[in-house]
């Protein structure tokens, strides 16, 4: 879920903290990517038609591999250096949110059965996507693929977004890529949305800067975290009836969550029983992340050509010629990206962002083409 309504809230109340950039402007940048979010999107859109998905001869889904392979090559060709961060064990406080997601998938499965009986194509498409879940096998497949491509993988001890934010704060990467806004709540200095969107969407990258958010909202980081918890996060229920704008007013008026309940109209607003907002706050401020330099030895290397052929072609039915051509693209791209950005050699100049007006762009509001990508493989699975 991320932080409910945060994009709109920032667009309306902290517009200078957001700017639109071209995809190509991130040449030479190292970026940390929330892997699970990307895999989820690939499973939803890549090669999908109704309930049909790309598979290998064993009937195993390969949409995530095709999406990860082609999208990562696009990043490399643009001179971008990706680091994929995978989720570890979720915090106990997230169990309630995960249970809700499980229930929603179960409901969608029932709705899908009804849609299949009535042959309603629109409902089949809609409910089929709602049943998607990223599994351990999907994650393991993508880790293996990325390592064979020479792209670094970080396995977070807990939340991937928290680890991404830690990498960014440590200066290991320029920014964090995800679609969930809680990367900002974890304190990621720079947060990027839409960088992983397909080129066919032609949506600019939206860059958020947490320092400017705090400046425009006139808040401390602690107050921003409280604002996000009040707005609605994955770790605890919010106060019923309070949305982002009301949460903003309350934090500005009272300073922290501690001072809010006693000043609320209890008839109008319902405070959850056993509300663990303090534990949620602690998870945002002190998440479980890797900080040891030895464990974060992030390096990009040459692709393992033989390994990629074995994994993609022999094991997963990808087209050999397309994979071979894709490998050549990776090699050319890595030579290109080694040139680096100019500021690596010269003193950087200021690049002030231009404030933008509020412009909400729904995630996944356009269907990705079902045509096979250049390194595609597999067949449809019903």
From Swiss-Prot:
PROSITE patterns assigned to the protein according to its UniProt record, in alphabetical order: XPG_1, XPG_2
Positions annotated to bind Mg(2+) 1: 34, 87, 159, 161
Keyword Hydrolase found: yes
Residue segments, region Interaction with PCNA: 338-346
Species of the source: Glycine max (Soybean)
UniProt xrefs under PANTHER family: FLAP ENDONUCLEASE 1, FLAP ENDONUCLEASE FAMILY MEMBER
Protein name, UniProt field: Flap endonuclease 1
Xref: Gene3D superfamilies: 5' to 3' exonuclease, C-terminal subdomain, 5'-nuclease
Assembly and oligomerization: Interacts with PCNA. Three molecules of FEN1 bind to one PCNA trimer with each molecule binding to one PCNA monomer. PCNA stimulates the nuclease activity without altering cleavage specificity.
Record-stated family: Belongs to the XPG/RAD2 endonuclease family. FEN1 subfamily.
Biased amino acid composition, Basic residues: 372-382
EC number in record: 3.1.-.-
Keyword terms: DNA damage, DNA repair, DNA replication, Endonuclease, Exonuclease, Hydrolase, Magnesium, Metal-binding, Mitochondrion, Nuclease, Nucleus, Phosphoprotein
Cofactor: Mg(2+)
The keyword Methyltransferase appears for this protein: no
First and last residue of the signal peptide: none
Region (N-domain): 1-105
Ranges where the record places region Disordered: 339-382
Superkingdom as given in the UniProt entry: Eukaryota
Record's subcellular location: Nucleus, Nucleolus; Nucleus, Nucleoplasm; Mitochondrion
Gene Ontology MF terms: 5'-3' exonuclease activity; 5'-flap endonuclease activity; DNA binding; magnesium ion binding
One GO CC term on file: nucleolus
Cofactor note: Binds 2 magnesium ions per subunit. They probably participate in the reaction catalyzed by the enzyme. May bind an additional third magnesium ion after substrate binding.
């Amino acid at each position: 879920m991320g932080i409910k309504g945060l994009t709109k809230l920032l667009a309306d109340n902290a517009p200078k903290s957001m700017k639109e950039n071209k995809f190509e402007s991130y040449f030479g940048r190292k970026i940390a990517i929330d892997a699970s979010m990307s895999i989820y999107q690939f499973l939803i859109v890549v090669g999908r038609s109704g309930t049909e998905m790309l598979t290998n001869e064993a009937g195993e889904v390969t949409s995530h591999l095709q999406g990860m392979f082609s999208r990562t090559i696009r990043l490399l060709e643009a001179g971008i250096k990706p680091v994929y961060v995978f989720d570890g064990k979720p915090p106990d406080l997230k169990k309630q949110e995960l249970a809700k997601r499980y229930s929603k998938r179960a409901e969608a499965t029932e709705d899908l059965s009804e849609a299949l009986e009535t042959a309603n194509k629109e409902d089949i498409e809609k409910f089929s996507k709602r049943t998607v879940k990223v599994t351990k096998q999907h994650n393991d497949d993508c880790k293996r693929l990325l390592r064979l491509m020479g792209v670094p993988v970080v396995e977070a001890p807990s939340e991937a977004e928290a680890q991404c934010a830690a990498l960014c704060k440590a200066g290991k990467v320029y920014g964090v890529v995800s679609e969930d806004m809680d990367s900002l709540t974890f304190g990621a200095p720079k947060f990027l949305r839409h960088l992983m969107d397909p080129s066919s969407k032609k949506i600019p990258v939206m860059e958020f800067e947490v320092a400017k958010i705090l400046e425009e909202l006139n808040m401390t980081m602690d107050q921003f975290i409280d604002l996000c918890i009040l707005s609605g996060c994955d770790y605890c229920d919010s106060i019923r009836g309070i949305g982002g704008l009301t949460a903003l007013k309350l934090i500005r008026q009272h300073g922290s969550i501690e001072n809010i309940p006693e000043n609320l109209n209890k008839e109008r607003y319902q405070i959850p029983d056993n509300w663990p907002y303090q534990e949620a706050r602690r998870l945002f401020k002190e998440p479980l992340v890797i900080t040891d330099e030895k464990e974060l030895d992030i390096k990009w290397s040459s692709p393992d050509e033989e390994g990629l052929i074995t994994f993609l072609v022999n094991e997963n039915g990808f087209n050999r010629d397309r994979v071979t051509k894709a490998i050549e693209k990776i090699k050319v791209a890595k030579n290109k990206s080694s040139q680096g950005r100019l500021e690596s050699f010269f003193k950087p100049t200021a690049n002030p962002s231009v404030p933008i007006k509020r412009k909400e762009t729904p995630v996944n509001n356009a269907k990705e083409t079902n045509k096979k990508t250049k390194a595609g493989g597999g067949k449809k699975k019903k």
